[in-house]
Amino acid sequence: MTNVNAVRFESVDVVFGQRAGEAIALMDQGEGRDSILEKTGSLVAVHDASLFVNEGEILVLMGLSGSGKSSLLRCVNGLNKVSRGRVMVKAGEKEVDVASCAEDVLREVRRNRISMVFQQFALMPWLTVRDNVGFGLDIRGTPKAERDRLVQEKIDLVRLGQFAEKFPHELSGGMQQRVGLARSFATEAEILLMDEPFSALDPLIREHLQDELIELQRNLKKTIIFVSHDLDEALKIGTRIAIMEAGRVVQFAVPEEIILNPVNDYVRQFVASMNPLTVLKGGTLMRPADDLVREPGSSFIQLDRAGRCRCQLDSAGRPNNLMVNGRPGQFVQYSTELDLAAAADDAVMITGSDRTPMRAAVTVRQLTKRPLVLLGDDGALLGVVGEHELYRGMLRQTEAAKVNVSGPNKAVV
């Protein structure tokens, strides 16, 4: 991931109807969505949306039905006309405003920069899996040898090699959506637009495909804008999340910020039943290294509040000379295969990173009775997550999720 914007929305308005100009004037006067619809017959689908997604990130647009998330997504490839504002898409070394560029420029961006995955798969029923995956390449006019190579590569990537000559009706829903993913990957577009791609699937299949998408993203590093109405899904896959209500972006933040600091009651209703264990990360929970107790007259610092686990730091801030209950100890990196119960019997402390999930910290604390030690990519001590930090994290999430309204906000359908 980089800090370079792949797509940037700048004060985007989308109005459907014949009297968009009048509707925009009323928007500027502070009129609400329902009032504008009544007065002009025009629907404000998106109102003053400003957000971005960096290269290699996943931005999730989420909200209730009618909140404007799909309407905003479809501005990126020009399927929806932007009434006001700019949608900047990185195309090579330059940026293109797809809201105002010439038609030939927009076609070029669609053909080479952007691909789309739909909720209902959008496969051609008369084409085999192989030909569905190659459809975008055929439209582009890709030479046959290159086309065949790319198609086979992407079919294998989504593990559908043995089904390449099957037709869509011969596949399960989950397999059909894998074909849709392979078709998007085959064009080698850098930006993928995914409009509730898994919502039509059974829960277990949906969760499995979410995991597959995360794994594929680790290798492909695409820029993805993903529409969802499911906060669990958004928190699981999103680098950043934009929560929308009645056409407006009400909060745009990383998942942990959404959970810990919801901006209003609408967002609090989404997070009220969230399990923080898979969302909150070590970096959010930890007691920083600078706050750890330094022992007077010694170079040791205490890694736990009881002082049973102690270490020194080298000149680069890396921990060494670990002592656990008076015995020389060792640091062992956390993994799901690690025998933590055995580690509790040895002079071992488990290490993770600022990205280690809260669930792992809970497991380490429960089975070893010691804090999780967080290290940076350079091995320097970042901090620790012990019992106190875990309780504090749970309390912060509980307080953040408290709702002060008597009932749910009215959805706009």
Residue ranges and their predicted role:
Residues 26-35, 90-98, 134, 138, ...:
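Conserved ABC ATPase "signature" region
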Residues 290-326, 346-378, 384-413:
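The conserved cystathionine-beta-synthase
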Residues 36-40, 95-115, 261-262:
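ABC ATPase NBD coupling module
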